[in-house]
């Protein structure tokens, strides 16, 4: 199967899946099983299609180009986060919620011609033909589960997985802390607070991605860049342990989300410019999905055990979270140093 066709075919499958769910929902009156299947699929799709997108980006751009451009590219996610809810609000009233799946399918088909255009630019404008054999001349084959073997047998990929696992752990800690503190507020008040935080996150993420991320990587290097948000979160959780106030948790949540969109996520995706095509398209989705969902599950159990099992309060849980953030920082520094070494043997090796 040609690498050139892999990403367009994946987007075609994504688009087709929404059409299938729409048709099934129209045919069958009893939709309980269909709705459950759709929920499971969306939970996987929400991570998988983003993973495929970033695999494609790390295929197009060199290490140096990714350092300059990935922050700007990531702004698209923040802009989409602003536009998406507006589209849903407009068309859900006039078309109904079911037909929104057709709109989602159409929006997934639009990038396909853009993908072919960008593939042509790789050698014509970006001058990246030296990164790999031209995409059209390579095939992907072998065991479709090879990504799991690549992940668990390669220390670099394992470290990326641990980094994602710790990120999801911190995310869950901050979210649960915030949720507990907001429990005393009414539902309208909570809605206003969440909306204000979302607005702050989008503004901060877009401005940072456009004007700062590339400069941060270029000036301070990858170790400092990828460890920047973890360090800030670690310090913030220590402050929260001393002063368990709602304002502190809100700031932590805003910094964590905006920092992930604008700095941590782009920096993390730059790490995959060092690996070969096979690893990029087989192991990366495994890392993104398994580590992310696994981190969610483990952290939920841990938080429940600490609060309900051991009866720990906000301050104690924040202190434990600070320790996790400290470990997250160390893993980030390790990955950043590996990235800057740019081991050519790793790039061309079989994983």
Task: Tell me what each language-model feature is.
Residues 34-93, 136-150, 155, 163-213, ...:
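Substrate-agnostic recognition of the 12-TM MFS/MFS-like secondary transporter fold
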Residues 223-263:
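C-terminal transmembrane helical hairpin of 12-TM major facilitator-type secondary transporters
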Residues 9, 72, 102-103, 162-163, ...:
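Hydrophobic core positions of alpha-helical segments in small-molecule transporters
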Residues 11-18, 105-109, 168, 202, ...:
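Residue-level recognition of pore/gate-forming positions within transmembrane alpha-helices
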Residues 2-8, 87-109, 189, 193-196, ...:
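A membrane-interface helix-boundary motif in multi-pass transporters
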Residues 2-5, 23-26, 31-36, 63-67, ...:
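Intracellular loop-helix junctions on the cytosolic face of multi-pass helical membrane proteins
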Residues 12-31, 116, 213, 231-245:
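C-terminal ends and interior cores of transmembrane alpha-helices
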């Amino acid at each position: 199967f040609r690498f050139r066709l892999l990403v367009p075919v994946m987007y075609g499958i994504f688009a087709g899946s929404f059409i299938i769910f729409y048709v099934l929902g129209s045919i069958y009156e009893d939709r309980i099983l269909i709705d459950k299947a759709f929920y499971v699929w969306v939970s996987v799709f929400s991570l998988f299609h983003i993973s495929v997108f970033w695999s494609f980006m790390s295929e197009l751009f060199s290490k140096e180009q990714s350092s300059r451009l990935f922050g700007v590219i990531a702004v698209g996610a923040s802009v989409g986060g602003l536009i998406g809810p507006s589209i849903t609000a407009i068309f859900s009233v006039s078309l109904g919620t079911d037909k929104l799946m057709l709109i989602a399918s159409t929006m997934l088909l639009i990038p396909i011609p853009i993908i072919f255009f960008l593939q042509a630019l790789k050698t014509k404008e970006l001058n990246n033909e030296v990164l790999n054999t031209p995409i059209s001349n390579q095939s992907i084959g072998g065991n479709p589960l090879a990504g799991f073997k690549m992940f668990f047998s390669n220390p670099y990929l394992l470290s990326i997985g641990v980094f994602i696992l710790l990120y999801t752990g911190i995310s869950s800690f901050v979210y649960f802390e915030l949720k507990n503190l907001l429990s005393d507020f009414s539902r309208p008040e909570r809605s206003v607070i969440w909306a204000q935080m979302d607005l702050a996150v989008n503004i901060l993420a877009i401005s940072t991605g456009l004007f700062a991320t590339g400069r941060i990587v270029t000036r301070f290097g990858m170790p400092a860049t990828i460890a920047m948000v973890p360090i800030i979160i670690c310090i913030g959780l220590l402050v929260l342990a001393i002063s368990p106030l709602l304002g502190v948790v809100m700031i932590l949540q805003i910094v964590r989300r905006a920092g992930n969109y604008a700095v941590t996520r782009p920096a993390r995706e730059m790490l995959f410019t060092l690996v070969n095509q096979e690893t990029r398209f087989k192991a990366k989705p495994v890392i993104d999905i398994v580590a992310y969902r696994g981190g969610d599950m483990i952290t939920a159990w841990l938080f429940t055990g600490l609060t309900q099992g051991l009866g720990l309060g906000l301050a104690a849980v924040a202190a434990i979270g600070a320790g996790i953030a400290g470990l997250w920082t160390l893993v980030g520094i390790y990955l950043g140093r590996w990235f800057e070494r740019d081991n050519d043997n790793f790039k061309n090796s079989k994983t």
